[in-house]
Each structure stands twice: as structure tokens, then as C-alpha cells.
Amino acid sequence: MAVAHGPVATSSPEQNGAVPSEATKKDQNLTRGNWGNQIEFVLTSVGYAVGLGNVWRFPYLCYRNGGGAFMFPYFIMLVFCGIPLFFMELSFGQFASQGCLGVWRISPMFKGVGYGMMVVSTYIGIYYNVVICIAFYYFFSSMTHVLPWAYCNNPWNTPDCAGVLDASNLTNGSRPTALSGNLSHLFNYTLQRTSPSEEYWRLYVLKLSDDIGDFGEVRLPLLGCLGVSWVVVFLCLIRGVKSSGKVVYFTATFPYVVLTILFVRGVTLEGAFTGIMYYLTPKWDKILEAKVWGDAASQIFYSLGCAWGGLITMASYNKFHNNCYRDSVIISITNCATSVYAGFVIFSILGFMANHLGVDVSRVADHGPGLAFVAYPEALTLLPISPLWSLLFFFMLILLGLGTQFCLLETLVTAIVDEVGNEWILQKKTYVTLGVAVAGFLLGIPLTSQAGIYWLLLMDNYAASFSLVVISCIMCVSIMYIYGHRNYFQDIQMMLGFPPPLFFQICWRFVSPTIIFFILIFTVIQYRPITYNHYQYPGWAVAIGFLMALSSVICIPLYALFQLCRTDGDTLLQRLKNATKPSRDWGPALLEHRTGRYAPTTTPSPEDGFEVQPLHPDKAQIPIVGSNGSSRLQDSRI
């Protein structure tokens, strides 16, 4: 995507992303903190964007929507919606050096968008860590000579269990071996029954109840693993981005090592090529279906983490002149390339399993928890040294989940700290992190009950679905049309040394909002009542799901009304104008960067359409302002 940057205004070397050593201290936010280096930010953002959905959702969508033909609408949506929205959120957070609440000094009436992002991140953070805890449980269960879901001779198995491997049918009692010959008859028989991996998942790990309202007992092994996962997340964030930035060197890179190991092992198996061809073979007639384009747009939108608040938060710890345009392109492409790569890993193993059973790949393909905890583990039992491959697979899932969970927790903590906005809360940030982690653990306990998986899927389907689309659409409109696209383009030029490329300007103003609106319409049209296997959710549960979805969106009009009521003005129109006008403390956080219309003055700047924070002309001071409007001035330590 070669697009000219346009005319470059007067800029220093640091404005192009390279901060010279003598200017490094001047570009650091000593009060709030920055990333140790830019690699930490890129790796953290990759870990945030590349999550479980890349492994268990994209490959399934690809083969269901035309195989290789799905790649065409997928990458079209990446270019015209994914990367532009990613760049917008990164530049938004980096320019203001504030989290998802503080950035709305740009237009205080829309601060409800930030609260909506917090609500979404809260929901996702609660259930996402439960998925990680289940991966921990499977990881620990894999530390054995024989995987516990390989056979049907366990206490929890039922007479309906029928597995590919069975100790009673082995020809060699000293070593587990696969049944010889064409196993299609066995698989057809199994279709009428249940696999050992499914019974292990449903009857042993979950002890699944019959109804979402029947919580039964809390599964203590899962509760323990949930505690482990929250402790790991807290320890990695104990010093904020300073500590998590070091952890991501491992958590963001090692999954690629595991993916590569599994890929090499997978493609050497008999039947792997068939699985990969099933994944990639294009069905070009599919691209004429609106559903395929809708799935492509939705997958791009959700997999990049747009409108969660995490991108704004992570970028807020960048140095002011960091080249976030470059970063957004790199991270977005890495995320999508990982999805495609994961598809090879998944379908090579599933192809091997289908070949072993003598059935079509579609009979063993699945997505979501069904892929991660039933289908793929079942396939791994067919491999020699299966516990080793199982350990690697679930360790990869744990790391992928943690990378996203770090940013979800940091989003909430940063929003709280920025909102209070005083030195005391900055000093107590570790305790804020601990408090949020403990609250997340307590709220996740019901999801470890016997009905927990029902609630987890309910939250996944409703809490972070169409609400994200609404939030993102309103964010685009408020920045481009309320604050003004010219103002925002000037802000980016001031920060990067060049304005956003013309392509991005067009996408932000017209193309991306249109695509977002299309996703919203598609989501509504394609809505189907949620089910889990053959279980139909009752109406009251679906109603709770819609309430969760609305709880984030409703923050936007409620806060807008609140802001209108507290804003001065003789008429409603005057109040509306004042409530949408940038606050006096909007702009770069550091005094050194407040140039042009943000330069410290003792009088308003009416020609720019909004006022800037007055600063004492004789003494360098940094405005320390809570996003609730309270402010104080602190002597600059720079």
C-alpha cells in the first residue's frame, strides 16, 4: 500500500519515529511512564491482537466461506477497515497520552464511548481468563504418560463412548496403537455416540449441567486454575507497562515457535495435504454471497481488538513522536498473517485425523471451544508421544490468551488511574491493579460452575458483538465530524511530522464508517438465537445477553445527557456546542510538545475553535489533569 505522505511540515528527526539520544529525556513522560523501547509496544500490541480467535475461529470461517476465496474479501476488509481503524486508535491514544477515558477531552460529551470501552473490556476480561484457566487445566492434565481423553475406560465415561483408540481393541498391549484398516465404519458408529475427548470435556472437566440456570457446584480444579491465571496476569502487570513490556518478549514470540513446531509436525503426517487443500481450495462463487463479506469484515474488526480500549491504552504509553503509522501497518498485517498461518497448523492435523478415520475433513472440523478442547485434542491422541504435542498446543493457547489479557487488565487500570489523575493514585497503581485482578477473579467464579460454559458463550456472543461496532462507529464520527478531520490531521502532522496519507484520510471519513455500518446491519440480519451443541438458550438468558450488550452502548447517551446538564449555556444549542468542544486540557501531555495552537497562553485562542490550558509563562509546568475535569499544575522535571 504505497501512498504518498504528502507535504512534510517542519519536523525534527524524532518526529519521524527516531528520537536522538539528546532528545530522549525530553520525549519521556516521567509522570506517567513510557514503554522501555518501541519493540515492547509492538510485541504487546501483537500479543493483544493475536489471540485465541486467530487459532479457533479464522480457519473455520475460511473453509466454511470458500477456502482460499475467503482470503480476497478478508484482505480487502483489512486494507479498507482494519488498518485504518487500528491507526486511528493508536494515534488517538499516543497524541493525548491518555487511556480510553482521558482521550475524550477531545469532545467531553462523547466520554461515554470510553466508559463503553471499559464495560466491554470488563466483560471480555472476565470470561477470557476462564478460557485461559481451562487451557491451564488441559496443560496440567497433559503431564501424563497417556492423555486422559484418549480412551473410554475412565470412570466418567458412559456406555455411549466410542473412541478411535481403545485399550480393549489394541493388538499390542505394551504400547497404544491406532486401530488398523479403514476406520470409516467406526467413525460412522461414533457419530451416533460420543468421543472420549468430548466426554472428558463435558462430563469430567465441566461436569456440564443440563441448563444455564442450574449452576450446580463450582469445579474446584477450574477455580484453582482460574486463580493461577489471575496471579500470573497480576504479577506480569505489577509494575504496569514496565514489567509487562519485558514479559511480552516471551509471551508474544513463543507462540510462533510452537505454531511452527506443530506446523512442521502436521505437514509430515499422512492426509495433511488433504486438510490444507480443504482449507485453501477456493470456491469463487462464494465471494458473491453477502454473508462471506460480512464474516470477513467481522473477523477483521474483532480480531484486531478495535473499540475495546486496549489499542488506545497501549499507544498512550508511547513517546509522543513515535511513528504509530508504521506500527499500525506492521501489527495489523502480522495479526492477519498469523490467522492464515494458524489455519495451516489446524487443518494439517485435522486432515491427518480425517484420513485416519476415512471420512471427509468437514466431519472433524469445528471452531471455538469445540476445536480447542474437543476436536484438536482428539486428533493429538493419534500422534506418537501425544502428551508432548498436547503440552505444546495448550501452552500456546495459554500464551495467546495471556497476551490479550494483559492489555485488557491494563486498559481498566489505566482508565481508573487517568480518571483520578493525581499523584497519590499514580503511586498506588499496583494496588489498583491488584484490586481489578481480585474483582475479575471473583466475577469469574460463576463461570467455573457446572453451568459456566453456557454463561461464557453467552458473554462471548453478546457482550462483545454489535456493541463494539456501535462504539467504533461513534468514535469515528466524533473525531472526524465533531472534532473535525482537519484538526485531527493537523494533530497527527504535529506528532509524526507528516499528515496521515490521503488513503487513510478517505477511509476515516467515508470508507471505514460505511463498512462499520455494513457490519452492524449484517450482524442484525444474520442474528440467530444462541445455542450450544443442541442446547437452546431460554428466552430469559437471551434477554440477559442483550442487556449485557446494551450496558456498554447505553453509556454513550447517558453520559452525553449528563455532560449536557453540567455544561454552561443559555440554550440547548449553546450547551451542545460547549459540551462537544475540546476541553482546555486536550492535547499533548508534556509542555515540550504543546506547540502551535496548544502553546501555553494566558488567553483563549478563539481562532482555533477551542481554548488551551493556560500555563505560567515564566516557569515550565506540566498540567496534571484528571479526565473528570479536576486539574493541578506540577513543576516540570524535564
From Swiss-Prot:
Keyword annotations: Amino-acid transport, Cell membrane, Glycoprotein, Membrane, Neurotransmitter transport, Phosphoprotein, Symport, Transmembrane, Transmembrane helix, Transport
Region (Essential for interaction with EXOC1): 627-638
Membrane topology: Multi-pass membrane protein
Side Extracellular, residues: 141-217
Family annotation (InterPro entries): Na/ntran_symport, Na/ntran_symport_glycine_GLY1, SNS_sf
Positions of region (Disordered): 1-30
GO cellular component entries: apical plasma membrane; asymmetric synapse; basal plasma membrane; basolateral plasma membrane; dense core granule; endosome; hippocampal mossy fiber to CA3 synapse; lateral plasma membrane
Glycosylation sites: N169, N172, N182, N188
UniProt topological domain (Cytoplasmic) ranges: 1-40, 563-638
Protein family: Belongs to the sodium:neurotransmitter symporter (SNF) (TC 2.A.22) family. SLC6A9 subfamily.
Oligomeric and partner information: Interacts with EXOC1; interaction increases the transporter capacity of SLC6A9 probably by promoting its insertion into the cell membrane. Interacts with EXOC3 and EXOC4.
Known role: Sodium- and chloride-dependent glycine transporter. Essential for regulating glycine concentrations at inhibitory glycinergic synapses.
Record protein name field: Sodium- and chloride-dependent glycine transporter 1
Record gene name: Slc6a9
